[in-house]
Design a protein with these regions (language model features):
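Cysteine-dependent PTP/DSP-like catalytic domain, specifically the C-terminal lobe
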Residues: 218-234
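Core catalytic lobe of class I
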Residues: 1-3, 7-223
Length: 234
C-alpha cells in the first residue's frame, strides 16, 4: 500500500482520499508538520499579488513587499521537506518575477525559467499571454530530456463550473501540471501543492498515479478541490 507522511493536524480541516490529503489551513503552518525529505515534487501557483491575486482581487507591488518574510520561510520549508532529487515548479507572472526570483534562487537555486504560452489573456489592453515557472531540479533529478516549451504552449484553461465560468481566477490546466509531475517523478511519488486553489495539482496527481498533499487556505476553494477529487474517484 502507498503511504504518505502522517501529520498531526487536529486543528485543521482536512479530507483524506485514496491518494492523499487536502488541508484547509495556512500552508506555512501545515508544511511545518511534514517530515524532512518526504516530498518528491512541488508544483504550486502562489497568489498573484501584482494584478490578479489568489482570491481574484486586485493587488499591488506593496502587497509583495510585505510578504517577503512569508516567502523566505516558505522556501526554506520547501528545502527542508524536499528529497535531494526533488523538482520544484513555482508559477509566477512577469510582474512578480523580480520579487520571487532572488529569494527562490538564494534559498533553493533556480535552474531554469519555463514559459507557458497560454494563448489568451484578460482585459482590454495587450493581453498577458505568457506565465513564468521558476524551476528547481534537485541533485540527480531527471526530467527525461523533454521539450517542455513546445509541449505546453497549446495547453488551455482548466476546469469550468456548470455555468461555464472558471472555478478559480488563476487556475492552471490539469494537463500542464500533469506533464510537469510526470516529467519529474515516477508513479507513486508524493506531490506537494502549498497553494492548492481549485485542485488542478490534486487532479493531475490522481490521473498520473502519484500521491498528493494539497494545502488551501480559502474554505471555498478547499471544498471545490474536494468535490473535484470526489468526481475523479467515481
Amino acid at each position: 500500500m502507498l503511504r504518505y507522511p502522517s501529520c498531526n493536524l487536529s486543528t485543521y480541516d482536512r479530507r483524506e482520499f485514496p491518494g492523499g490529503t487536502v488541508y484547509n489551513g495556512d500552508c506555512l503552518d501545515v508544511i511545518k508538520t511534514l517530515p524532512e525529505s518526504s516530498v518528491d515534487c512541488i508544483a504550486t501557483d502562489p497568489p498573484y499579488f501584482l494584478g490578479m491575486t489568489h482570491n481574484g482581487q486586485k493587488g499591488n507591488f506593496r502587497d509583495l513587499s510585505i510578504c517577503r518574510p512569508f516567502y523566505r520561510d516558505l522556501f526554506n520549508e520547501f528545502r527542508r521537506v524536499c528529497r535531494p532529487e526533488a523538482c520544484i515548479y513555482f508559477f509566477c507572472d512577469w510582474r512578480g518575477y523580480a520579487f520571487y526570483y532572488p529569494l527562490f534562487d538564494e534559498i533553493l537555486k533556480a535552474h531554469n525559467m519555463l514559459v507557458w504560452n497560454k494563448l489568451s489573456g484578460p482585459g482590454n489592453h495587450y493581453a498577458f499571454i505568457h506565465e513564468l515557472v521558476l524551476f528547481h531540479a534537485g541533485k540527480g533529478a531527471n526530467i527525461g530530456g523533454t521539450s517542455i516549451i513546445s509541449d505546453i504552449r497549446a495547453f488551455t484553461s482548466g476546469a469550468k463550473s456548470t455555468d461555464g465560468d472558471k472555478v478559480h481566477p488563476t487556475q492552471k490546466p490539469v494537463a500542464l501540471i500533469q506533464k510537469f509531475i510526470e516529467d519529474a517523478t515516477a508513479p507513486g511519488a508524493l506531490i506537494l501543492d502549498t497553494f492548492g486553489g481549485s485542485g488542478a495539482t490534486a487532479v493531475a496527481a490522481v490521473r498520473s498515479g502519484r500521491r498528493f498533499i494539497i494545502m488551501e487556505q480559502d474554505e471555498g476553494y478547499y471544498h471545490t478541490t474536494c468535490k473535484r477529487l470526489e468526481n475523479e474517484y467515481r
